[in-house]
Regions:
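Extended hydrophobic
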Residues: 196-272, 291-295
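N-terminal helix-turn-helix
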Residues: 2-102, 106, 273, 277-281
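Amphipathic alpha-helical effector-binding/dimerization core
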Residues: 88-189
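Amphipathic alpha-helical regulatory segments at dimerization interfaces
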Residues: 41, 57, 108-119, 126, ...
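Cysteine/selenocysteine-centered motifs that mediate thiol-based redox chemistry or coordinate metal-sulfur cofactors
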Residues: 190-193, 271-295
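Short, solvent-exposed recognition segments
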Residues: 3-5, 12-14, 149-225, 295
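Short, solvent-exposed cationic patches
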Residues: 162-165, 262-282
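A structural signal for short hydrophobic beta-strand segments in well-ordered beta-sheet cores
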Residues: 78-79, 128, 236
């Protein structure tokens, strides 16, 4: 597997190097955590991994590497497809189904977004959430493509897609609402990516841009892969005011369509509030079920 600065392999190397060092409490990164790092190597372009190469990336011996893979196979998270080659296993499908039933944001979002199909004529609406250092699309309504002058433009950021934290409206609106120490840590670790995304060439400029986004209450961007696609995102906060996700609307990048979707911002913000309320209600109902079972 070729490695580059921004590849999953390079991030895994950085993780192993930094997180294997003793922490302030004197702990080291556990073998379980190192084993689970293997799952981070799977991407849309890397759908199988080789045991020998992973052993080198993890900095462990051949026997340890094989043991990690065997344990992941025993759990159903991986399956061997050939000599030394592994892909994701069937347990992942089972977990995905359980996630559909149990995730509060997903269930609340699906309920609300069902009532928003009226704004999805030649537009796609996505529900996004923060996952580690990236943003994940977890639900989608509307078409899989947007038509522009009789040309069908595919939506590249559909359900299950991971978006870079600094690129795109759905990500930037979440980034702007992170707590200050998270934003500061992001800047210290990812200055090059922040600059490349046009979010600032200094800490002061970066912080100022995020403050402006928060005050504005929404973000619009033009597609990096297709500049004829316009993206508009608004934040979803929980009952405590903390960011929990975003609603991302994709449409044609024309003056007329831009005006139309900007007029939809109050509606989108109202629906985000509904998602937050339904999410809290879903959590309370889950707690009630658990308590009734336990007591």
């Amino acid at each position: 597997m070729p490695s580059s600065k921004n590849s999953p392999q390079s991030h895994l190397k950085e993780s192993v190097v930094s997180e294997s060092q003793p922490s302030s409490a004197g702990n080291t990164r556990s073998s379980v955590a190192r084993m689970l790092d293997i799952l981070d190597l799977f991407t849309p372009t890397t759908t199988k991994v080789q045991v020998d190469e992973v052993g080198q990336l993890l900095g462990v011996g051949r026997s340890t590497s094989y043991r990690y893979f065997q344990e992941l196979c025993d759990s159903g998270l991986l399956v061997q497809q050939g000599k030394g080659w592994y892909t994701l296993g069937s347990r992942v499908i089972e977990l995905e189904q359980l996630l559909q039933l149990s995730d509060p944001l997903l269930n609340a979002g699906k309920t609300v977004m069902t009532d928003m199909l009226d704004i999805c004529q030649n537009r796609t609406l996505l529900l996004c959430t923060l996952f580690k250092d990236r943003v994940l699309c977890i639900h989608q309504i509307g078409p899989d493509h947007i038509t522009h002058n009789n040309e069908k433009m595919p939506i590249y950021r559909g359900r299950g897609s991971a978006l870079p934290l600094f690129q795109g409206a759905g990500s930037q609106i979440i980034l702007a609402h992170l707590v200050p120490h998270q934003i500061r840590s992001m800047y210290l670790l990812r200055q090059d990516e922040i600059t490349a995304a046009g979010l600032g060439t200094s800490w002061k400029e970066f912080r100022t841009n995020l403050t402006m986004i928060r005050k504005q209450g929404f973000v619009t961007t033009v597609g990096k892969l297709n500049p004829r696609v316009l993206a508009l995102a608004v934040p979803i906060n929980n009952y405590a005011g903390q960011i929990t996700g975003s609603l991302l609307l994709l449409c044609n990048n024309t003056n007329t369509e831009r005006e139309h979707v900007l007029n939809l911002i109050p509606r989108l913000k109202s629906e985000c509030q509904r998602i937050s309320e339904l999410k809290l209600d879903f959590i309370r109902r889950q707690d009630l079920v658990v308590n009734n079972k336990l007591f």
